[in-house]
Amino acid sequence: MNFRARDHKRGILLTSLITTLLLLTPLTQAQNNYALPPPNIPGIPQEPSNNSYPNPEYARLIAYSLYFYEAERSGKLPTDNRVSWRHDSALNDGQEVGLDLSKFTFPLSWTITVISWGALEWSKGYELANQTQYLRDMVNSSAHGTDVSGETAAAMAASSLLFRNQFNDTGYANTLLTYAKNLYSFAETTPFTLYQNSVPQVKSAYSSSSYFDELVWGALWLYRATNDTSYLDKAVNYFNTNSLSGLKKIFNWDEKSGGCYVLFAQLFQQSGQDSSKWKSEAERYLDGIVNQSDGCTFTNGGLYWCDGDSDQASLNPSLDTAFLCLIYAPIATSSAKTQTYVNFALSQIDYVLGKNPINTPYVVGVHPNSPQNPHHAGAHGGNDVSNLNNPPQTQHVLYGAIVGGPNKKDKFSDSRTDFIQTEVALDYNAPFQSLMAYQMINSRSDPYYVNVPPGKPQPKISVGAIVAIVIICVILLIIAILLFLKRKKIAEWWKNRRQ
Protein backbone atom coordinates (compact mmCIF):
# COMPACT_ATOMS: atom_id res chain seq x y z
CA MET A 1 0.00 0.00 0.00
CA ASN A 2 1.44 3.41 -0.98
CA PHE A 3 1.53 6.42 1.32
CA ARG A 4 -1.24 8.23 -0.59
CA ALA A 5 -3.65 5.33 -0.17
CA ARG A 6 -2.72 4.99 3.51
CA ASP A 7 -3.30 8.71 4.11
CA HIS A 8 -6.61 8.47 2.30
CA LYS A 9 -7.69 5.58 4.51
CA ARG A 10 -6.63 7.45 7.66
CA GLY A 11 -8.55 10.48 6.51
CA ILE A 12 -11.71 8.44 6.07
CA LEU A 13 -11.29 6.84 9.50
CA LEU A 14 -10.69 10.24 11.13
CA THR A 15 -13.76 11.67 9.43
CA SER A 16 -15.85 8.75 10.66
CA LEU A 17 -14.61 9.18 14.23
CA ILE A 18 -15.30 12.92 14.21
CA THR A 19 -18.79 12.32 12.84
CA THR A 20 -19.48 9.83 15.63
CA LEU A 21 -18.24 12.23 18.30
CA LEU A 22 -20.47 14.97 16.93
CA LEU A 23 -23.43 12.62 17.20
CA LEU A 24 -22.63 11.85 20.82
CA THR A 25 -21.54 15.29 22.05
CA PRO A 26 -24.22 17.99 22.53
CA LEU A 27 -23.44 21.31 20.98
CA THR A 28 -22.75 24.01 23.53
CA GLN A 29 -24.57 27.26 23.14
CA ALA A 30 -22.98 30.60 23.75
CA GLN A 31 -24.56 32.52 26.58
CA ASN A 32 -26.96 35.22 25.49
CA ASN A 33 -29.27 37.65 27.20
CA TYR A 34 -32.74 36.19 26.80
CA ALA A 35 -34.49 38.57 29.19
CA LEU A 36 -37.27 40.59 27.59
CA PRO A 37 -36.37 44.23 26.90
CA PRO A 38 -37.82 46.59 29.52
CA PRO A 39 -40.88 48.70 28.71
CA ASN A 40 -40.57 52.45 28.39
CA ILE A 41 -42.16 53.19 31.76
CA PRO A 42 -40.84 55.86 34.15
CA GLY A 43 -38.74 54.34 36.89
CA ILE A 44 -38.08 51.02 35.12
CA PRO A 45 -34.28 50.62 34.64
CA GLN A 46 -33.34 50.45 30.96
CA GLU A 47 -29.74 49.22 31.16
CA PRO A 48 -29.32 45.69 29.72
CA SER A 49 -28.06 42.85 31.90
CA ASN A 50 -24.32 42.27 31.74
CA ASN A 51 -23.39 40.49 34.99
CA SER A 52 -22.31 43.86 36.37
CA TYR A 53 -22.73 45.21 39.89
CA PRO A 54 -25.17 46.51 40.84
CA ASN A 55 -27.10 44.22 38.53
CA PRO A 56 -29.65 46.01 36.31
CA GLU A 57 -31.84 42.91 35.98
CA TYR A 58 -32.36 42.64 39.74
CA ALA A 59 -33.04 46.38 39.77
CA ARG A 60 -35.73 45.77 37.16
CA LEU A 61 -37.26 42.96 39.23
CA ILE A 62 -37.62 45.31 42.21
CA ALA A 63 -39.05 48.01 39.94
CA TYR A 64 -41.45 45.55 38.31
CA SER A 65 -42.75 44.37 41.68
CA LEU A 66 -43.40 47.96 42.76
CA TYR A 67 -45.13 48.53 39.40
CA PHE A 68 -47.31 45.48 40.10
CA TYR A 69 -48.45 47.04 43.37
CA GLU A 70 -49.33 50.23 41.52
CA ALA A 71 -51.47 48.15 39.16
CA GLU A 72 -53.43 46.93 42.19
CA ARG A 73 -54.53 50.40 43.28
CA SER A 74 -58.14 51.47 43.02
CA GLY A 75 -60.09 54.60 43.81
CA LYS A 76 -58.98 58.01 42.60
CA LEU A 77 -55.53 57.44 41.12
CA PRO A 78 -52.78 60.06 41.44
CA THR A 79 -51.60 62.09 38.48
CA ASP A 80 -48.27 60.23 38.41
CA ASN A 81 -49.97 56.85 37.85
CA ARG A 82 -47.55 54.77 35.75
CA VAL A 83 -49.98 52.01 34.74
CA SER A 84 -51.49 53.41 31.55
CA TRP A 85 -54.30 50.86 31.42
CA ARG A 86 -55.48 51.52 34.98
CA HIS A 87 -57.92 54.35 35.61
CA ASP A 88 -60.05 55.60 38.49
CA SER A 89 -62.17 52.74 39.78
CA ALA A 90 -64.35 51.63 42.69
CA LEU A 91 -65.16 55.22 43.60
CA ASN A 92 -68.29 53.92 45.31
CA ASP A 93 -68.84 50.68 47.18
CA GLY A 94 -70.20 48.79 44.16
CA GLN A 95 -73.62 48.19 45.70
CA GLU A 96 -75.43 50.11 42.97
CA VAL A 97 -74.12 47.68 40.31
CA GLY A 98 -74.17 44.53 42.40
CA LEU A 99 -70.41 44.23 42.83
CA ASP A 100 -68.48 43.13 45.90
CA LEU A 101 -65.53 45.52 46.18
CA SER A 102 -64.32 44.33 49.57
CA LYS A 103 -60.77 44.97 50.67
CA PHE A 104 -59.17 42.52 53.06
CA THR A 105 -57.09 44.30 55.69
CA PHE A 106 -55.69 41.12 57.21
CA PRO A 107 -53.52 39.90 54.28
CA LEU A 108 -52.85 43.49 53.18
CA SER A 109 -51.37 44.36 56.58
CA TRP A 110 -49.14 41.28 56.49
CA THR A 111 -47.95 42.35 53.04
CA ILE A 112 -46.99 45.81 54.30
CA THR A 113 -45.23 44.33 57.34
CA VAL A 114 -43.10 41.94 55.28
CA ILE A 115 -42.18 44.58 52.71
CA SER A 116 -41.25 47.00 55.49
CA TRP A 117 -39.20 44.33 57.27
CA GLY A 118 -37.34 43.51 54.09
CA ALA A 119 -36.75 47.19 53.37
CA LEU A 120 -35.38 47.75 56.87
CA GLU A 121 -32.95 44.86 56.42
CA TRP A 122 -31.96 45.49 52.80
CA SER A 123 -32.67 49.18 52.18
CA LYS A 124 -29.41 49.40 50.24
CA GLY A 125 -30.97 47.15 47.60
CA TYR A 126 -33.68 49.72 46.92
CA GLU A 127 -31.09 52.49 46.86
CA LEU A 128 -28.88 50.62 44.36
CA ALA A 129 -31.94 50.02 42.19
CA ASN A 130 -33.03 53.68 42.44
CA GLN A 131 -36.42 52.53 43.71
CA THR A 132 -36.53 54.12 47.17
CA GLN A 133 -39.08 56.77 46.18
CA TYR A 134 -41.36 54.19 44.59
CA LEU A 135 -41.09 52.07 47.74
CA ARG A 136 -42.09 55.08 49.82
CA ASP A 137 -45.08 55.76 47.59
CA MET A 138 -46.13 52.13 47.79
CA VAL A 139 -46.00 51.84 51.58
CA ASN A 140 -47.58 55.29 51.98
CA SER A 141 -50.67 54.26 50.01
CA SER A 142 -51.53 51.65 52.09
CA ALA A 143 -63.91 46.08 61.99
CA HIS A 144 -63.14 44.69 65.17
CA GLY A 145 -61.04 41.59 65.35
CA THR A 146 -58.12 40.78 67.65
CA ASP A 147 -56.12 39.17 64.83
CA VAL A 148 -56.59 42.00 62.31
CA SER A 149 -55.94 44.69 64.91
CA GLY A 150 -52.72 43.01 66.00
CA GLU A 151 -51.53 42.52 62.42
CA THR A 152 -52.43 46.06 61.39
CA ALA A 153 -50.62 47.41 64.44
CA ALA A 154 -47.56 45.43 63.31
CA ALA A 155 -47.85 46.85 59.78
CA MET A 156 -48.05 50.44 61.00
CA ALA A 157 -45.26 49.98 63.53
CA ALA A 158 -43.00 48.43 60.89
CA SER A 159 -43.90 51.17 58.42
CA SER A 160 -43.17 53.83 61.02
CA LEU A 161 -39.65 52.45 61.36
CA LEU A 162 -39.22 52.65 57.61
CA PHE A 163 -40.39 56.26 57.42
CA ARG A 164 -38.31 57.27 60.42
CA ASN A 165 -35.05 55.46 59.60
CA GLN A 166 -35.02 55.29 55.80
CA PHE A 167 -37.21 58.11 54.53
CA ASN A 168 -36.41 60.66 57.28
CA ASP A 169 -40.10 61.54 57.63
CA THR A 170 -40.50 61.83 61.39
CA GLY A 171 -43.94 63.41 61.21
CA TYR A 172 -45.53 60.61 59.23
CA ALA A 173 -43.62 58.01 61.27
CA ASN A 174 -45.12 59.44 64.45
CA THR A 175 -48.60 59.36 62.92
CA LEU A 176 -48.22 55.71 61.97
CA LEU A 177 -46.86 54.84 65.39
CA THR A 178 -49.79 56.52 67.13
CA TYR A 179 -52.23 54.50 65.04
CA ALA A 180 -50.23 51.34 65.75
CA LYS A 181 -50.41 51.91 69.51
CA ASN A 182 -54.13 52.65 69.39
CA LEU A 183 -54.84 49.56 67.29
CA TYR A 184 -52.86 47.34 69.61
CA SER A 185 -54.65 48.77 72.61
CA PHE A 186 -57.94 48.09 70.83
CA ALA A 187 -56.85 44.49 70.20
CA GLU A 188 -56.03 43.98 73.87
CA THR A 189 -58.96 45.75 75.49
CA THR A 190 -61.84 44.36 73.44
CA PRO A 191 -62.93 40.74 73.90
CA PHE A 192 -60.54 38.41 72.10
CA THR A 193 -62.13 36.99 68.97
CA LEU A 194 -61.34 35.98 65.41
CA TYR A 195 -62.36 38.72 63.01
CA GLN A 196 -64.61 36.45 60.93
CA ASN A 197 -66.80 36.12 64.02
CA SER A 198 -67.40 39.87 63.80
CA VAL A 199 -67.42 40.06 60.00
CA PRO A 200 -68.81 36.72 58.75
CA GLN A 201 -68.50 37.81 55.12
CA VAL A 202 -64.71 37.28 55.20
CA LYS A 203 -64.90 33.67 56.37
CA SER A 204 -64.95 32.22 52.85
CA ALA A 205 -62.02 34.34 51.67
CA TYR A 206 -59.36 35.22 54.26
CA SER A 207 -60.44 33.74 57.55
CA SER A 208 -58.03 33.67 60.48
CA SER A 209 -57.01 30.53 62.35
CA SER A 210 -55.82 32.19 65.59
CA TYR A 211 -55.00 35.55 67.14
CA PHE A 212 -52.33 34.99 69.78
CA ASP A 213 -49.58 34.93 67.13
CA GLU A 214 -50.78 38.37 65.97
CA LEU A 215 -50.73 39.68 69.54
CA VAL A 216 -47.10 38.57 69.87
CA TRP A 217 -46.26 39.84 66.37
CA GLY A 218 -47.80 43.26 66.94
CA ALA A 219 -46.13 43.68 70.33
CA LEU A 220 -42.73 42.78 68.89
CA TRP A 221 -43.02 45.37 66.15
CA LEU A 222 -44.18 48.01 68.61
CA TYR A 223 -41.19 47.22 70.80
CA ARG A 224 -38.88 47.56 67.82
CA ALA A 225 -40.48 50.88 66.89
CA THR A 226 -40.58 52.38 70.40
CA ASN A 227 -37.95 50.60 72.53
CA ASP A 228 -40.70 50.43 75.16
CA THR A 229 -39.97 47.21 77.03
CA SER A 230 -43.59 46.89 78.13
CA TYR A 231 -44.36 45.74 74.59
CA LEU A 232 -41.59 43.17 74.73
CA ASP A 233 -42.97 41.94 78.04
CA LYS A 234 -46.41 41.59 76.46
CA ALA A 235 -44.94 39.61 73.55
CA VAL A 236 -43.10 37.23 75.87
CA ASN A 237 -46.18 36.78 78.05
CA TYR A 238 -48.53 36.01 75.16
CA PHE A 239 -45.93 33.65 73.72
CA ASN A 240 -45.39 31.72 76.94
CA THR A 241 -49.02 31.46 78.01
CA ASN A 242 -50.47 30.35 74.67
CA SER A 243 -48.27 27.41 73.62
CA LEU A 244 -46.56 29.12 70.69
CA SER A 245 -43.20 27.37 71.17
CA GLY A 246 -41.98 24.81 68.65
CA LEU A 247 -44.72 25.21 66.07
CA LYS A 248 -44.07 24.06 62.50
CA LYS A 249 -46.67 26.15 60.73
CA ILE A 250 -45.88 27.92 57.47
CA PHE A 251 -45.20 31.65 57.82
CA ASN A 252 -47.85 33.58 55.88
CA TRP A 253 -50.59 36.20 56.20
CA ASP A 254 -52.52 33.97 58.61
CA GLU A 255 -49.73 32.37 60.65
CA LYS A 256 -46.95 34.48 62.22
CA SER A 257 -45.25 32.04 64.64
CA GLY A 258 -42.22 31.44 62.39
CA GLY A 259 -41.78 35.18 61.94
CA CYS A 260 -42.10 35.69 65.70
CA TYR A 261 -39.22 33.25 66.38
CA VAL A 262 -36.94 35.13 64.00
CA LEU A 263 -38.01 38.59 65.17
CA PHE A 264 -37.62 37.61 68.85
CA ALA A 265 -34.05 36.42 68.13
CA GLN A 266 -33.25 39.62 66.23
CA LEU A 267 -34.58 41.95 68.91
CA PHE A 268 -32.96 40.16 71.84
CA GLN A 269 -29.61 40.07 70.02
CA GLN A 270 -29.81 43.74 69.02
CA SER A 271 -30.64 44.80 72.59
CA GLY A 272 -27.74 42.83 74.05
CA GLN A 273 -30.00 40.48 76.00
CA ASP A 274 -29.62 36.71 76.17
CA SER A 275 -31.03 35.56 72.84
CA SER A 276 -30.24 31.84 73.21
CA LYS A 277 -33.85 30.79 73.85
CA TRP A 278 -35.11 32.64 70.82
CA LYS A 279 -32.30 31.52 68.56
CA SER A 280 -33.12 27.97 69.60
CA GLU A 281 -36.75 28.56 68.62
CA ALA A 282 -35.77 30.14 65.31
CA GLU A 283 -33.26 27.45 64.40
CA ARG A 284 -35.56 24.61 65.37
CA TYR A 285 -38.11 26.15 63.01
CA LEU A 286 -35.70 26.85 60.13
CA ASP A 287 -33.83 23.55 60.51
CA GLY A 288 -37.15 21.77 60.16
CA ILE A 289 -37.60 23.53 56.83
CA VAL A 290 -34.18 22.90 55.30
CA ASN A 291 -33.93 19.34 56.68
CA GLN A 292 -37.51 18.41 55.77
CA SER A 293 -38.36 17.44 59.33
CA ASP A 294 -41.30 19.86 59.46
CA GLY A 295 -43.56 17.58 57.42
CA CYS A 296 -42.79 19.33 54.14
CA THR A 297 -40.59 18.16 51.29
CA PHE A 298 -39.22 19.26 47.91
CA THR A 299 -40.52 18.60 44.42
CA ASN A 300 -38.23 16.77 42.01
CA GLY A 301 -37.35 20.18 40.58
CA GLY A 302 -36.37 21.58 44.00
CA LEU A 303 -39.41 23.63 45.04
CA TYR A 304 -40.13 23.62 48.79
CA TRP A 305 -43.53 21.95 49.06
CA CYS A 306 -45.98 21.71 51.96
CA ASP A 307 -49.12 19.70 51.29
CA GLY A 308 -52.17 21.86 51.83
CA ASP A 309 -50.46 25.26 51.79
CA SER A 310 -48.58 24.62 48.55
CA ASP A 311 -51.67 23.15 46.88
CA GLN A 312 -53.27 26.60 46.99
CA ALA A 313 -50.29 28.71 45.88
CA SER A 314 -47.08 26.73 45.61
CA LEU A 315 -44.66 29.66 45.43
CA ASN A 316 -46.01 31.20 48.61
CA PRO A 317 -44.42 28.80 51.17
CA SER A 318 -41.22 28.78 49.11
CA LEU A 319 -40.79 32.56 49.06
CA ASP A 320 -42.01 33.14 52.62
CA THR A 321 -39.58 30.62 54.11
CA ALA A 322 -36.72 31.85 51.92
CA PHE A 323 -37.39 35.34 53.27
CA LEU A 324 -37.18 34.18 56.90
CA CYS A 325 -34.00 32.21 56.21
CA LEU A 326 -32.20 35.27 54.83
CA ILE A 327 -33.46 37.53 57.62
CA TYR A 328 -32.14 35.15 60.27
CA ALA A 329 -28.97 33.83 58.59
CA PRO A 330 -26.60 36.64 59.76
CA ILE A 331 -27.27 35.89 63.44
CA ALA A 332 -27.31 32.08 63.27
CA THR A 333 -25.33 30.23 65.95
CA SER A 334 -22.79 28.83 63.48
CA SER A 335 -21.36 29.68 60.08
CA ALA A 336 -22.55 26.29 58.84
CA LYS A 337 -26.15 27.12 59.73
CA THR A 338 -25.80 30.54 58.14
CA GLN A 339 -24.66 28.98 54.88
CA THR A 340 -27.37 26.32 55.00
CA TYR A 341 -30.11 28.92 55.37
CA VAL A 342 -28.64 31.09 52.61
CA ASN A 343 -28.27 28.11 50.27
CA PHE A 344 -31.88 27.10 50.84
CA ALA A 345 -33.12 30.63 50.13
CA LEU A 346 -31.02 30.99 46.98
CA SER A 347 -32.27 27.65 45.68
CA GLN A 348 -35.86 28.84 46.01
CA ILE A 349 -35.05 32.18 44.39
CA ASP A 350 -33.42 30.38 41.47
CA TYR A 351 -36.43 28.09 41.09
CA VAL A 352 -38.82 31.03 40.91
CA LEU A 353 -36.52 32.77 38.41
CA GLY A 354 -36.43 29.87 35.96
CA LYS A 355 -34.15 27.15 37.33
CA ASN A 356 -36.87 24.53 37.22
CA PRO A 357 -37.82 21.59 34.99
CA ILE A 358 -39.83 23.73 32.56
CA ASN A 359 -37.46 26.74 32.42
CA THR A 360 -40.24 29.08 33.52
CA PRO A 361 -39.56 32.23 35.54
CA TYR A 362 -42.77 32.73 37.49
CA VAL A 363 -42.57 36.51 37.16
CA VAL A 364 -44.78 38.10 34.52
CA GLY A 365 -43.07 40.12 31.81
CA VAL A 366 -39.39 39.25 32.29
CA HIS A 367 -38.78 36.43 29.78
CA PRO A 368 -40.48 34.76 26.79
CA ASN A 369 -41.20 31.77 29.05
CA SER A 370 -42.88 33.92 31.72
CA PRO A 371 -46.59 33.30 32.40
CA GLN A 372 -48.65 34.98 29.69
CA ASN A 373 -52.13 34.69 31.21
CA PRO A 374 -52.22 35.77 34.86
CA HIS A 375 -55.60 35.50 36.54
CA HIS A 376 -56.11 39.27 36.77
CA ALA A 377 -59.16 41.08 35.42
CA GLY A 378 -57.45 44.40 34.74
CA ALA A 379 -54.51 42.93 32.86
CA HIS A 380 -56.80 40.61 30.90
CA GLY A 381 -58.69 43.61 29.57
CA GLY A 382 -61.98 41.82 28.98
CA ASN A 383 -65.44 42.99 29.96
CA ASP A 384 -67.30 39.68 30.03
CA VAL A 385 -67.22 38.41 33.61
CA SER A 386 -68.83 35.13 32.57
CA ASN A 387 -66.07 34.31 30.06
CA LEU A 388 -62.46 34.68 31.22
CA ASN A 389 -61.22 33.71 27.74
CA ASN A 390 -62.81 36.64 25.96
CA PRO A 391 -60.55 37.98 24.61
CA PRO A 392 -58.22 34.95 24.52
CA GLN A 393 -55.03 37.02 24.72
CA THR A 394 -54.10 39.05 27.79
CA GLN A 395 -54.28 42.69 26.72
CA HIS A 396 -51.80 44.24 29.17
CA VAL A 397 -48.54 42.99 30.67
CA LEU A 398 -48.75 42.81 34.46
CA TYR A 399 -45.02 43.36 34.94
CA GLY A 400 -43.57 41.91 38.12
CA ALA A 401 -46.56 39.85 39.22
CA ILE A 402 -45.79 36.52 40.91
CA VAL A 403 -48.32 33.85 39.96
CA GLY A 404 -49.53 31.01 42.16
CA GLY A 405 -47.00 28.59 40.73
CA PRO A 406 -46.65 24.99 39.51
CA ASN A 407 -48.11 21.80 40.91
CA LYS A 408 -46.27 19.13 42.90
CA LYS A 409 -44.91 17.61 39.68
CA ASP A 410 -43.36 20.95 38.65
CA LYS A 411 -45.97 21.33 35.90
CA PHE A 412 -47.57 24.70 35.20
CA SER A 413 -50.85 25.49 33.46
CA ASP A 414 -50.59 28.95 31.91
CA SER A 415 -54.34 29.48 31.80
CA ARG A 416 -56.17 32.32 33.50
CA THR A 417 -59.03 29.92 34.26
CA ASP A 418 -56.64 27.89 36.43
CA PHE A 419 -56.70 30.45 39.21
CA ILE A 420 -54.67 28.31 41.64
CA GLN A 421 -51.64 28.38 39.34
CA THR A 422 -52.05 31.76 37.63
CA GLU A 423 -53.72 33.97 40.23
CA VAL A 424 -51.68 36.90 41.51
CA ALA A 425 -51.96 38.42 44.98
CA LEU A 426 -50.49 41.17 47.12
CA ASP A 427 -48.95 38.72 49.58
CA TYR A 428 -47.20 36.68 46.85
CA ASN A 429 -45.03 39.64 45.90
CA ALA A 430 -44.17 40.78 49.43
CA PRO A 431 -41.38 38.27 50.18
CA PHE A 432 -40.31 38.23 46.52
CA GLN A 433 -39.69 41.98 46.45
CA SER A 434 -37.63 41.78 49.63
CA LEU A 435 -35.63 38.84 48.29
CA MET A 436 -34.81 40.83 45.16
CA ALA A 437 -33.53 43.67 47.36
CA TYR A 438 -31.27 41.11 49.06
CA GLN A 439 -30.03 39.90 45.67
CA MET A 440 -29.46 43.47 44.54
CA ILE A 441 -26.94 43.82 47.36
CA ASN A 442 -25.37 40.38 47.32
CA SER A 443 -25.53 38.89 43.83
CA ARG A 444 -22.72 39.35 41.34
CA SER A 445 -24.45 37.52 38.48
CA ASP A 446 -27.65 37.77 36.46
CA PRO A 447 -30.91 36.12 37.50
CA TYR A 448 -31.12 32.57 36.18
CA TYR A 449 -33.64 33.30 33.42
CA VAL A 450 -31.31 35.73 31.63
CA ASN A 451 -29.37 32.81 30.14
CA VAL A 452 -32.36 30.52 29.51
CA PRO A 453 -33.29 30.28 25.80
CA PRO A 454 -36.99 30.67 24.95
CA GLY A 455 -39.05 27.51 24.79
CA LYS A 456 -39.76 24.67 27.16
CA PRO A 457 -37.25 21.79 27.41
CA GLN A 458 -37.90 18.50 25.66
CA PRO A 459 -38.12 15.31 27.73
CA LYS A 460 -34.66 14.16 28.74
CA ILE A 461 -33.22 10.99 27.18
CA SER A 462 -32.73 8.29 29.78
CA VAL A 463 -29.29 6.90 30.60
CA GLY A 464 -30.30 3.57 29.08
CA ALA A 465 -31.29 5.24 25.82
CA ILE A 466 -27.99 7.14 25.70
CA VAL A 467 -26.04 3.90 26.21
CA ALA A 468 -28.05 2.22 23.46
CA ILE A 469 -27.37 5.11 21.05
CA VAL A 470 -23.64 4.96 21.83
CA ILE A 471 -23.53 1.19 21.23
CA ILE A 472 -25.45 1.49 17.96
CA CYS A 473 -23.18 4.30 16.73
CA VAL A 474 -20.05 2.31 17.60
CA ILE A 475 -21.42 -0.78 15.82
CA LEU A 476 -22.27 1.30 12.75
CA LEU A 477 -18.79 2.80 12.81
CA ILE A 478 -17.17 -0.67 13.01
CA ILE A 479 -19.36 -1.91 10.16
CA ALA A 480 -18.41 1.13 8.08
CA ILE A 481 -14.71 0.53 8.70
CA LEU A 482 -15.00 -3.18 7.85
CA LEU A 483 -16.90 -2.40 4.68
CA PHE A 484 -14.22 0.07 3.69
CA LEU A 485 -11.40 -2.39 4.32
CA LYS A 486 -13.19 -5.16 2.41
CA ARG A 487 -14.44 -2.95 -0.37
CA LYS A 488 -12.41 -4.69 -3.12
CA LYS A 489 -13.64 -8.15 -2.12
CA ILE A 490 -17.18 -6.85 -1.87
CA ALA A 491 -16.92 -5.26 -5.30
CA GLU A 492 -15.53 -8.49 -6.76
CA TRP A 493 -18.29 -10.54 -5.10
CA TRP A 494 -20.93 -8.23 -6.44
CA LYS A 495 -19.42 -8.36 -9.92
CA ASN A 496 -19.36 -12.18 -9.91
CA ARG A 497 -22.94 -12.33 -8.69
CA ARG A 498 -24.18 -10.22 -11.55
CA GLN A 499 -22.49 -12.39 -14.16
Predicted regions and their residues:
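N-terminal secretory signal peptides that target proteins for export/translocation
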Residues: 1-8
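Cleavable N-terminal signal peptides of Sec/SRP-targeted secreted and luminal proteins
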Residues: 8-30
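Aromatic (Trp/Tyr) and acidic
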Residues: 33-121, 133, 141-162, 202-244, ...
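A conserved hydrophobic secondary-structure block that centers on an alpha-helix together
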Residues: 143-183, 190
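Internal metal/ion-chelating core segments
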Residues: 169-223
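Zinc-dependent metallopeptidase catalytic helix centered on the HExxH motif
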Residues: 248-252
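Single-pass type I membrane protein transmembrane segment
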Residues: 462-480
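Non-transmembrane, juxtamembrane loop and terminal tail segments
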Residues: 497-499
